[in-house]
Structures are given as structure tokens and as C-alpha cells.
Amino acid sequence: MSGTLVRMAGPTVVAEGLAGASLNEVVRVGEERLLGEIIRIEGDRATIQVYEETAGLALGEPVEASGEPLAVELGPGLLGSVFDGVQRPLSELAAREGDFLGRGASLPALDRARAWEFEPAVAPGDRVEGGVRLGVARAPGAPDHPVVVPPGVAGRVAEVRAGARRVEEPAVLLEGGATLALLERWPVRRPRPARRRLPPDVPFLTGQRVLDCFFPVSAGGTAVVPGGFGTGKTVLEQSLAKWAAADVVVYVGCGERGNEMSEVLDEFPRLEDPRTGGPLLARTVMIVNTSNMPVAAREASIYTGAAIAEYFRDMGRSVALMIDSTSRWAEALREISARLEEMPGEEGYPTYLASRLARFYERAGRVETLGGAEGAVTMVGAVSPPGGDLSEPVTQCSLRATGALWALSADLAHRRHYPAVDWSVSFTLEGDRLAGWFEREAGDGFGALRDEARKLLQRERELAEVAELVGTESLQDAERLVLESARLLREGFLRQSALDPADATCPPAKAFEMLRLFLEWHRRAGAAIGAGVPLRSILDTGLGARLLRLGQLPAAEVPAAAAALRADLSEALARMEAE
């Protein structure tokens, strides 16, 4: 089916003669066959968002409908790849086209020439359905790739073709003539089905103490990370990619500046995966859509990332989907909405911004897959509010749709406190659901310690305002102890060095032991002050400096170091009280 161009407005064009076309159908626009997607149909007129630069198009040029929705290719070779927002392989296109892509440039997302050794797990006569594992695809230098039956496909196996297969070649033939290859295609805007959702009672461990202990998120949960320029969003996401409990990381660079994305592309291949010792990129899929790329492709990029993440989830893997940033995606939505002449909402964003964000975040979750395995997609969406204003629409809509807020503070970042998570603004809605897991796995009383630490930090904020007016020396020793204990907690527990091998990640048991010791120091020092011991004498023992060094110790050495410090604290306080 083909039509002709009758109207153009930036990345949005209108074609007529497409009466039989469907919403979200892929089309090729103009003589250069630019990629586009139908976003509105009125009679035989279709409004199309074009995923490439539209300058130079002329009225009357042909528009050809494909009959298929915008879809991604899923199969062996995804891991370690870098795509643009509509899954064009950037490395291969750069080798063919140079550093700047020509219009209409297109290549298959997965390498058609590469051969994979298919080792089947089914035999003729077996009945298979969506989610059943067909076998494993292997290739030198690549991780093993499970091959599963796509959702909606079922039948009895007629023939299995083991051995070297290219991704498009049939690997399993079903009775009735249907074939299953290593490659499948899936519409990006349609969530992949699962057998059932599982309760969110297992945490998504990040390795960052401030997040795991104070603001945890469940595996399959959602978190929003708002922060202004220079607050460490990218460094935090790199730390999460490296240390979080995820088998696969899907990183979507949505509308960020080109130099920032080039820095990420330069650094990611050099990051070492602590699990395997190999490059972190080997278990990462990167989707790059910079701010100078067409705005429509930016809108599609997060759905491309979600479809890829759900594909790996259906293999029984835990996937971390990171979007940097949803603000740029919302700006693309605003521009497209303006081109469509829709009624604007707050700050010009479309009125359906909240529902679109909520629908996207609903694709996260911990599920039992169609094949009976357990998989999860955990979403972490960065937000770039102008001027750090958390009351702007994208942040507020994200807060309503997600389970945690990890707010980054420019003030903490300027003080070189990383991760710069503001504990006075951040929150989680999943703390109570995850409390049982932390009590079992980290240590009994974990929740009580966390609440005590929060109260200590809140008390410090109150006293800091008084101290600014009258000076620290005017406070009583008990009040000055609160300030000192909170300082130790901030610098020794909440702050982490991403460059220190022992401190870059922290397991829950180590975090529990550290938190217990910090608060025990505060309680026992407070009791000693109540018995008449001056605060200066307690500080002169040097035990506070030893507390600050706990995080730099390997997790296996922390219990012994904590026991020694606890014994020295008891001895020092007993001696001072006796004097």
C-alpha cells in the first residue's frame, strides 16, 4: 500500500491514500525511504512521525506502508551491541557510512552473516509453547544465549536442525509448517506477556549503602533519579550497572548531549565486570539517541529498551533498565504533540504525559515467565529537572508512577559527597515490603537501626540551624555529640568511593554491621556524657577515625574489625567513667 505526502511540519508529515493502514504501522517516506511510524489516522490520511531528518522532502513524494508495527529484532548478538533509538546498529553503520549517518541508512540489527552453534534442548515429538527453551546458541567470544519460543507460538516439534545456524535460518520446524529461528521480532510498544506477577518482596541490591539501607527498591521495581547538572547521575548509573544484582543491563541514553554519550561509550567498554573479570559491555545493551538525532526516534528509544529488557527477562534473568533521561523523552513527546496541534498541558507538555509514563513504568516487574522461570525488569529513570526544580511536571508524573525517589543534591555533590543522594528528600514506598528480607539476610533488627539512623540525621538538621545562629561551642555536649555522630554516619556510612575496590560495593551484611557499630558508638558515648565524661575526651580517643575507615575494609574483615573497635570503645569509656 502506498500514498503521497500532502503536508510536512518538522519530523511530522501527513500522507493521504493510506486508508487501510494501521496505527503504529511502519512506513517508508519519500524517495530516500526514510523510516517513520503512523501515529494518527483520519480517513485515508495518516499522520506519520519520521525517525530521520525530513529536510529536503517534497510534497507528492511516495509513502509506502509496510503492514508491520515498529518492532525490534531479538536474538543472539544483542549483548555488547550499541544501537540507536530504532535499533540500527551504530558500529556497523559507522564502518559503512562514516561518523555521520546518511538519510535512509539501514542495516539489520543483528549480524546476518555470523554463525551460531545451536545446541537443542528439544526433540521431534515434543510439544512446545511460548516461553519453552528450545536450546542454547553459542559462538566464540560471546556468552551462551538461550533460545526460547516466542509468546503466542505453540505446536509439536517436527524437526530439529542442530549445528551452525545463522540467526534467520530455521532451527526448529513445527508440525504444520511453522519454523522457529534464533531470531524473533517483537513490537516495541506491546509488553511481552508473563504467566503471573510475583510479589515485590526481594530487593534489587545496588551495592550502594544509602540506597540499599535507606531507600531500597524491589527486584522488578521502579525508581526515579532526579538531579541537576553535575550531581553525579551518570556516575551513579555506571556504579549501578557495575555492581547491582542484575544479569543484564540495558542502558538507554535518551536525548542527552552528544559529548556526554560519547564519554559513556568511551568509558563503558573499559569498565571491568566484577563478576567475570571481562568488559562490562559484554552483558550490556546500549541504546544511544543523542539530542542532535531526530526527536521522533528519541520518543521510540525507551520502548526499544523495554522490549529488549523483557526479552532477557523471559529467559529467567534479572535485568536493569536505565533511562538517561526521561526528561528528554518527555521533551520529544511535547514537540511531537505541538506538531500535531494537540491541547497543551502544564508547561506545554501533552495532557497524557502522566498516563504515558505510567504505562511505560508498568512494564517493570518481577514475574514468572511463560516457561516457568523467574525473571525481573527493574527500571531506574534519571530525570533532569531545569534548575533542580522537583515540582516540574516530568518529575511529578514520574513520582506518581514509581516506587522510589533517589533525589540527587547539588549541595552534596559540591561537597564531594557521592553518591549525592539527599536523604532528607528521597523516599521509598517498598521499605515495609522488603523489611522481612533484610531482617533475614542482613541481620535481626535491621529496620530498627535504619529508623534510628534516620532520626539521628533529622536531629542533626534541626541542631545545624541552631548552631549556625549561636555557634557550635554554645551547644551542650549531648547536642554536639549528635552533630559529631551524624557527621561520622554521613562520611563513613552514607558516602562511598566508586574508585575504592572494597568500598565501591557493600553487601547488606557488611552494611548492617557498620550501621550497628556507628549507632552503638553514638548511644554509648551519649551514656558516658550523661555520666559526666566530657565530649572532648571521647573524641580524643581516635575511635571516630577508625569508624570512618570501616567501609574501606573487605566485607570478610569487617566483623573482626568491628569486634576489636567495640572492645576498645568499652575499655576507653570505662576508664574515663572511672576517672
From Swiss-Prot:
One of its GO terms (biological process) is proton motive force-driven plasma membrane ATP synthesis. It catalyses: ATP + H2O + 4 H(+)(in) = ADP + phosphate + 5 H(+)(out). PANTHER family: H(+)-TRANSPORTING TWO-SECTOR ATPASE (PTHR43607:SF1), V-TYPE PROTON ATPASE CATALYTIC SUBUNIT A (PTHR43607). InterPro entries: ATP-synt_VA_C (IPR055190), ATP-synth_a_Xtn (IPR031686), ATP_synth_asu-like_sf (IPR023366), ATPase_F1/V1/A1_a/bsu_N (IPR004100), ATPase_F1/V1/A1_a/bsu_N_sf (IPR036121), ATPase_F1/V1/A1_a/bsu_nucl-bd (IPR000194), ATPase_F1/V1_b/a_C (IPR024034), P-loop_NTPase (IPR027417). Belongs to the ATPase alpha/beta chains family. It is an enzyme of class 7 (translocase). Pfam families: ATP-synt_ab, ATP-synt_ab_N, ATP-synt_ab_Xtn, ATP-synt_VA_C. GO terms for molecular function: ATP binding; proton-transporting ATP synthase activity, rotational mechanism; proton-transporting ATPase activity, rotational mechanism. Produces ATP from ADP in the presence of a proton gradient across the membrane. The V-type alpha chain is a catalytic subunit. This is V-type ATP synthase alpha chain.
